[in-house]
């Protein structure tokens, strides 16, 4: 393996990531909020996480996806809603879009008026067919991860087990 070619003095700097190791998956939660944030700092971090997640998922969406801007609008509001839930993961987005009972429970607790209006007016007033169509572009992309055993093990964890800022800052 490649590990045999790493100089001994650098072995502690190596992070071995094997997505097929289902017994010891690295956790990577794209929606994880740092603990202890409040007020404007929390709002700013939620915006950063929302835009970063959209950026990652945009790479999966093809440029010719019809309704790409509409998909991003729905995705942005869904991520912002997910970020109001303790321990939200990428799969929370899927659940919000596809599980009406769960969505009703979550939206009842929302304090943000814009998010309340989105779920009430955009999603709530849409017919079943329209609602499915709005969610389809997003759920098809996230569904790729839901049905991959290795991706699911990595992305469904509430706490990330690797800190990429630390990895980059420490020269690993």
What spans do the regions from the language model cover?
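P-loop NTPase motor domains
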Residues: 1-172
């Amino acid at each position: 393996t490649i590990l045999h070619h790493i100089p001994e003095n650098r072995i502690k700097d190596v992070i071995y990531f094997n997505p097929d190791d289902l017994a010891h998956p690295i956790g990577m939660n794209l929606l994880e909020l740092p603990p202890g944030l409040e007020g404007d700092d929390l709002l700013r971090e939620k915006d950063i996480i929302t835009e970063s997640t959209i950026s990652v998922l945009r790479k999966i969406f093809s440029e010719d996806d019809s309704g790409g801007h509409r998909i991003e609008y729905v995705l942005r509001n869904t991520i912002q809603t997910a970020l109001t839930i303790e321990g939200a993961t990428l799969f929370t987005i899927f659940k919000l879009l596809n599980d009406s009972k769960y969505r009703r429970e979550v939206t009842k607790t929302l304090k943000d008026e814009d998010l309340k209006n989105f779920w009430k007016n955009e999603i709530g007033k849409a017919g079943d067919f329209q609602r499915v169509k709005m969610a389809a572009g997003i759920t098809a992309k996230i569904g790729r991860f839901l049905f991959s055993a290795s991706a699911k093990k990595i992305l469904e964890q509430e706490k990330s087990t690797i800190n990429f800022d630390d990895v980059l800052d420490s020269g690993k």
